[in-house]
């Protein structure tokens, strides 16, 4: 095994989902974008399909792969459409698309869609003053509006959450005046843990995979561990330890087959003594040749060492890595 392997616990993902669903008390739209945050979208979706109302992905390509895998649930594409090709593929695979602006709405003709509302994050969405016009345009284009959603930009800020919730509720009421069965959803993992308004559904992402966005805490279980193999033991010669001068004199070093080419940060971590190599890192001590070593079991702790978030670590490390599923 020359490359690291990610061991993903589907049992833990299901347990995390149960916890979040209990907190929210409404159906779940499970976010499996970016290959389920690096955990493998098809495998994760099959494991939790019986527990969710719908899946959400980033792109039409991601949605098409889920449908082709036979996950048996509707799939919402969160990124607005930008081309006729997107629209054709969305139609072919029966995807639910996002209409977030008048240009994106134009590509949604005849499609099932959720309207995105910009309540303060300023990423995607119609502004509240555009909702009435958007509904008129949707009717002209025969868009089948099945939902309306927004996103909390700082779920730990109670004042901001209150303002966004109020704005969203007003916009959702307008949408429901034209489409009474439109599903309203606002809260992702942070919003759920903050006790935000659940409306008709919630959209957990990070929490499914075992992490609460700071500053929240919850009894979630990280679902991915990454293992790398000892590929050499070295009696040190000269002054290096990987790509750096050794900080001290070593009596023994070993090399693991994991580096920044596998999504880890070049600056270090994983117990490395120097900067990581592309496909390897050097650590102190001696371990039997071929030993499997866990190099990542807490993405939040690893992220904190590098001034980033668990989101970035999971997506970077999980991307393209061989995965073994447990439970």
What function would you assign to each model-found segment?
Residues 4-15, 23-183:
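Active-site-proximal beta-alpha core segment in soluble small-molecule metabolic enzymes
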